[in-house]
């Protein structure tokens, strides 16, 4: 039996801001539940071929659609694992004057994945801990932005910000 992936992107662009739209193009790893010899042809490109139970990289939008159709499971990116989030949070705390480098579109990708019931295999406690760590990281970064803006006098001459990425 051949699986068919239907992609509906009709109204997606007008529902999303630029950052979310761009994040949907970032690649994630999936574990397909089907095998196909030919690549799957979608509006934004071809993906595959897929082998059941073998990891494959696809754009986030395709992974979300396939997961919705229960055709795959999405692997959490390494940086969304509890230990890595703790490290990023602790690094952010330890460096009050700089923004620690974080993955591009980390907030958009994280909240897209955290909204899926099967991402943590039904472990709601792990999901809750991950959400808490992510929010702590975001708050630390936003606090740095606010403090930085407060420190400006009335005539700033230069603004140099690195690794701010959606705070």
Locate predicted features.
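Phosphate-binding glycine-rich loops and adjacent basic patches that engage nucleotide phosphates
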Residues: 22-30, 72-74, 92-96
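N-terminal, Lys/Arg-enriched amphipathic/low-complexity engagement segments
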Residues: 1-45
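Charge/polar-rich, low-complexity and marginally structured segments
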Residues: 2-20, 80-167
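Compact, well-ordered interaction domains used in eukaryotic information-processing assemblies
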Residues: 21, 35-87
């Amino acid at each position: 039996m051949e699986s068919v992936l239907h992609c509906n992107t009709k109204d997606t662009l007008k529902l999303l801001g630029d950052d979310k739209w761009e994040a949907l193009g970032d690649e994630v790893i999936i574990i397909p539940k089907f095998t196909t010899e030919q690549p799957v042809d979608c509006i934004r490109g071809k993906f595959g071929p897929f082998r059941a139970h073998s990891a494959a990289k696809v754009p986030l939008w395709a992974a979300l659609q396939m997961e919705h159709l229960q055709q795959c499971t999405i692997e959490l990116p390494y940086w969304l694992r509890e230990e890595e989030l703790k490290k990023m949070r602790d690094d952010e705390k330890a460096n009050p004057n700089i923004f620690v480098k974080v993955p591009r579109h980390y907030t958009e990708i994280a909240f897209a994945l955290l909204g899926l019931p099967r991402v943590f295999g039904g472990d709601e406690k792990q999901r809750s801990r991950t959400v808490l760590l992510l929010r702590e990281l975001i708050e630390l970064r936003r606090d740095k932005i606010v403090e930085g803006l407060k420190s400006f006098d009335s005539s700033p001459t230069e603004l140099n910000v690195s690794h701010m990425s959606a705070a």
